[in-house]
Amino acid sequence: LIRSISIDCEIDFLKVSSYQGKKTTGKIILEKDISSNISGRHIIIVEDIIDSGKTINFLLKKFKKKNCRSISIVAMLKKSNKFNFQLINEYIGFEIKQEFVVGFGLDYNQKFRSLKEIYILK
């Protein structure tokens, strides 16, 4: 994705988890936070998949507290769920059914990320 961006930007990473195997734990765990000062800046959250929406909602609340100028969401995949909140400024690659998928960066217990395509895990 970064190879396609033609503007000067700063990139930072965070790590959030909420799954054990194929099931969500219901808890959002922030394993690594960003180190950049994002106050007054335009932020783009890049996500592999939006499933229940709990993780993205957690991140939106977190970043809104940091007084970002704007927050946009880019996701490769979004499951067809109804969320308890409104997603705005979202850019979604593909909307998919309620199935557990792996490959192309998506994992199951830290496996299958390196698959070159996306597959349904049965």
Task: Give, region by region, the residue ranges found by the protein language model.
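PRPP-associated nucleotide enzymes
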Residues: 1-122
